[in-house]
């Protein structure tokens, strides 16, 4: 059963009441058709009111939903003949990042993304989508290979952050992320980055330097989690909801600030409600981006990417 978020409970309660009335009607001689139709109209209005007016904290909850589609869900639906590569050729394999090659509309591309698990066992194996340095080095190796063979790069971002453990730090976590930022800025192929869940801090940025940055409607992208920000600002992590309201971490806010290029719509109730439809919406955005970026020369791709990031954070008084 799909977990229910707290703000969705009025919708679920009304749906249960409709099901109850339908069952009663089928098993009795009393016709409640009009009452059911009235409740269904009320349900439609309620869904529109709740899902159409989500607060930042609600979007954080949606981004963290345990059933939210992962990178692999989209790879299976958008790309063909995908072959995953493994290892960074320095230390080992990191299953928190998936990286490989495949075809998009009959054209070869390199696809890289954070990968969470679907259950406890897989989450432990994939370290809950929090990469070690070898994950970022693996990704960079494949991005450099993409440049060598002139393949566009598409990345899917979905991580709470890079793994902060002692072993990861000893193996150069910060250096691995920093090198990815530097190298991605200068790669002479199109790079499209899509935030599909949580885009947490440097762990997200390690796959997030691109020509086009897109976000799903209910994803988040921030330098720190709302809980972390609340702990720093108010010494109280339970103030996360308040922090989320002020941090500007949602797709609509980041689009307005010029951090991202497009907000990708989600099916009503979130991407997990209809993965196929969500994949189709992402597919359309990838197609639009590639059509635009493939017209640019390698020099123009790099120049526009540099210009994009140089303008971030500027403002006029």
Swiss-Prot record:
InterPro entries: Acetyl_CoA_COase_a_su, ClpP/crotonase-like_dom_sf, COA_CT_C. It comes from the Bacteria. Belongs to the AccA family. SUPFAM superfamilies: ClpP/crotonase (SSF52096). One of its GO terms (biological process) is malonyl-CoA biosynthetic process. Its EC number is 2.1.3.15. It catalyses: N(6)-carboxybiotinyl-L-lysyl-[protein] + acetyl-CoA = N(6)-biotinyl-L-lysyl-[protein] + malonyl-CoA. NCBIfam families: accA (TIGR00513), AccA_sub (NF041504), PRK05724.1 (NF004344). It is found in: Cytoplasm. Pfam families: ACCA. GO terms for molecular function: acetyl-CoA carboxylase activity; ATP binding; carboxyl- or carbamoyltransferase activity. The keyword Transferase applies. Acetyl-CoA carboxylase is a heterohexamer composed of biotin carboxyl carrier protein (AccB), biotin carboxylase (AccC) and two subunits each of ACCase subunit alpha (AccA) and ACCase subunit beta (AccD). PROSITE patterns: COA_CT_CTER (PS50989). Residues 38-292 form the CoA carboxyltransferase C-terminal domain. This is Acetyl-coenzyme A carboxylase carboxyl transferase subunit alpha.
